[in-house]
């Protein structure tokens, strides 16, 4: 959650779902954020209905009270004053950084790793915007859309009057149409200390090469090229095996964003309708266009104006195809090709890290090197034979 969602001390708690657990977040009287199991340890009533007061969250069922670390402070229904000492709510450590609440769900006795130095995580509030939306599928199949550059010229393309696919160029993105014209990009995929860099080479009109560079950062972060001075990154937060909350951050490293650029702070995706947010985690950030109405596909628009026929909103278009795979796609039925090299490499990197942790207790790559996350997506045009890694070194820095 964002810090502002929890409000001032002793404000109302908020439901949170994370890694399949139902939790409740609150800010105590001293301003410390607590993240507890939603179930009261007494009889399982939801602490969401609790009273946040005087240094803890009090269950309204029998008045038991817990602090931000899960310690039971009071059990007023019990005659023994020492009874509370043997009761504890499951609690997870939280850290606030620049308007975002981060939680550590690892072993309670372990040392939490430092927070990654993601560009958006350190940008000033006035320099960034936030979009949040739900993806009703597994987090990895959703994330893979950001490392799959080949789909851009198909799914997101428009149709001109001749029936040709187009992604019209803009003043702040003059090479945008190249992804719709060169549909077979040449990929160069490179591992780095915190993930994978994906560079897609397409032919430009004048014989040069247009390079579109994206980043995968372990385990749930991506960054793709944005327009103009803006930078863009996402966090694909697993609510459970079949639901993902996408945090999209756009930021300018040095200047405040305009009102138009920051309109996403309310959690709305430009160009698409969204239901009013409820407090239930699986109702937050739901598109009006969904599986229930076939994502409002318009077959006439598909024939004349839009390759997909879906709304002119990339997140909605991505949701339609990714959710259509099912909650967890059966990857044993896939037929991967050369254009899927980045998908293959990201999966391999995740599997290698998971096995190393399981078999030898080896921490995932980059976890103790927060500076290795200072990478972002970018784009540039180079002459044939130019070294894209050297030419983009500065551009890739977040």
Predicted regions and their residues:
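Rieske [2Fe-2S] iron-sulfur-binding domain
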Residues: 2-129, 175, 186, 195-197, ...
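C-terminal catalytic domain of Rieske-type non-heme iron oxygenases
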Residues: 8, 32, 108-398
């Amino acid at each position: 959650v964002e810090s502002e969602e929890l409000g001032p001390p002793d404000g109302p708690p908020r439901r949170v779902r994370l890694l399949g657990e139902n939790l409740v977040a609150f800010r105590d009287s001293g301003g410390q954020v607590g993240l507890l199991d939603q179930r009261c340890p007494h009889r399982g009533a939801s602490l969401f209905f609790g009273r946040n007061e005087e240094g803890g969250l009090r269950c309204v069922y029998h008045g038991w009270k817990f602090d931000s670390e899960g310690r039971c402070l009071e059990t007023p229904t019990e005659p023994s004053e020492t009874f509370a000492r043997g009761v504890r709510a499951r609690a997870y450590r939280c850290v606030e950084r620049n308007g975002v609440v981060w939680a550590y769900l690892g072993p309670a006795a372990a040392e939490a790793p430092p927070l990654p130095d993601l560009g958006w995580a350190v940008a000033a509030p006035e320099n960034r915007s936030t979009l949040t939306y739900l993806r009703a599928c597994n987090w990895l199949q959703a994330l893979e859309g950001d490392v799959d550059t080949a789909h851009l010229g198909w799914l997101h393309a428009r149709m001109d009057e001749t029936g040709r696919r187009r992604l019209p160029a803009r003043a702040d993105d003059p090479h945008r149409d190249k992804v719709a014209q060169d549909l077979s990009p040449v990929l160069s995929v490179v591992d780095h200390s915190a993930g994978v860099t994906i560079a897609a080479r397409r032919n430009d009109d004048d014989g040069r090469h247009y390079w579109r560079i994206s980043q995968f950062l372990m385990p749930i972060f991506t960054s793709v090229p944005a327009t103009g001075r803006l930078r863009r990154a996402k966090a694909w937060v697993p609510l459970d095996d079949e639901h993902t909350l996408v945090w999209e951050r756009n930021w300018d490293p040095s200047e405040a964003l305009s009102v138009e650029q920051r309109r996403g702070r309310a959690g709305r995706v430009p160009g698409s309708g969204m239901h009013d947010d409820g407090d239930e985690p699986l109702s937050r950030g739901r598109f009006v266009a969904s599986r229930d109405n076939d994502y409002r596909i318009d077959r006439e628009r598909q024939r004349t104006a839009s390759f997909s026929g879906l709304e002119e909103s990339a997140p909605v278009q991505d949701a339609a195809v990714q959710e259509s795979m099912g909650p967890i796609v059966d990857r044993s039925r896939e037929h991967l090709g050369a254009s899927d090299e980045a998908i293959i490499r990201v999966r391999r990197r995740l599997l290698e890290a998971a096995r190393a942790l399981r078999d030898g207790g080896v921490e995932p790559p980059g976890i103790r090197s927060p500076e290795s996350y200072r990478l972002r997506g970018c784009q540039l045009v180079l002459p044939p034979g130019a070294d894209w890694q050297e030419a983009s070194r500065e551009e890739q820095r977040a």
